[in-house]
Amino acid sequence: MKQEKLNFTTKLAYGSGDMGPAITANILVFFLLYFFTNVAGLPPGMAGSILAIGKIGDAINDPIAGILSDRTRTKWGRRIPWMLFGTIPFGVFFFLQWLVPTFSSDPNTNNWYLFAYYIVVATLFNLAYTAVNLPYTALTPELTQDYNERTNLNSFRFAFSIGGSILSLILAGFISQAYPNDPLKEYFVLGLSSSLISMIAIFWATFRIQEKGSQPILNQQLRKTFGFILSATGIVFFILGIYRVFNDININLYGVLGILIGLQITLFGITLIFSKTESHLCDAEATLHRQSTQQESSIPIKEQLKIAFRNKPFLYVIGIYLSCWLAVQLTASILIYYVVSCMKMDKAAFPTVAIAVQGTALVMLFVWKYISEKIGKRSVFFIGTVIWIVAQGGLFLLQPGQTRELYLLAGGAGIGVSVAYLIPWSMIPDVIELDELNTGQRREGIFYSFMVLLQKFGLALALFLVGQALEWSGFIEASPGEAIPVQPDTALLAIRIAVAPLPAIILVFGLVIAYFYPITKEVHADIRAKIQAKKQVS
């Protein structure tokens, strides 16, 4: 069996494709609920309902987009066109979520208008997010079928993902310091800058990646031409940013943004200049791969879904993924309340706590990648998740003033969060190949979309219950422009439960499911050998 190794620039560009969704998702999960209750002034029950409705709409979009992307036929392939045309709406609708328009002088009436506005914008953003991110996630098995190379590719992906998450928190910290007494402007600038950086990251992947058996958007000559133009533009932004930073006594926010965007555009350009085309993406076998994928549309949608859910390892991966991301996003959505109200820390300190989680996760990502090659994905998941459960549970016991202990537990949680990024997404291509062995068809979009579908339905319910629990516990929302109120003991207890024991219990269920996951490294090698044998016979 020939090796399907990828060029470094391919891995780099592929990784950047998850940076945009990661930045926006991270900002949303850490700040949006807080923004609704403490900046827009919405009651927590109403705010939680907005998040839940948005996630339900997002979940409904996923299988539709998965099926449509599987059936898309263009010279650029099935996935890349979706990313190309969905990126600008993605950025625009993300930004619109951070505005607080005034519709009425009556606070109650205005709240209901805001409720409708945020639901419409969230629905449109989630539609654009799905159009960009779902085809992107389905690219992994299109780029390589090598077991270890896929883990390596996902390491790049989630390095950018976690790196983007950390970058978004650092950026949020700078912006918070720049506008300490103007939260409306603070979140306006945060939404705008995050949108720009995210769109550049997605376009980076879109214009560099080539799907198997398809043409790239830019040929080698155009890549070099655009690469030099982008590199020169990025260097100008970078120099202007440096100039503004070093000519200001205080931290110059626009200088920092110039440095970040300039560095990003420069790397984008360099990646295009030094790009190489992998032979396994354009040889005769790649052409056969493309022809085989074009036969999938003949299978009725209902039958495709039945085939997907008959794949038992797929159901295990769904359970593992659901447990991990429920824990991650439940914690993230409530963590800012925990830091400000339970630990009595300043809001400006929150990004550093979140960075302690994400920074540890970024470092451990490469450690787990190396270990998984030695002992397998399931064993890595067990080790990381046990550490995560211990750290998560410890948050319940912390009291105001125990800042050092908070950062230590945040780092411990980050060790586990890294396996949530790496392992479930590395398992999905193995499940897809088992389906290919059994059916002779490759349906990446179906598997990826339904994995995320169930996760989003679960998350929608969880976010709704968190919002309702805060309201039932007597949580006091802030009025726009006023100081954050002191919360009653019942609300503080609800926050502690949501940030510690609840995610830990969910993770225990994930461990139980992972114990029964059947595709080991040896089983996967056997699956690949049988697929190869079938291709040689045909």
Which residue ranges define each predicted feature?
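Membrane-embedded alpha-helical bundles of multi-pass transporters/translocases
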Residues: 1-283, 292-538
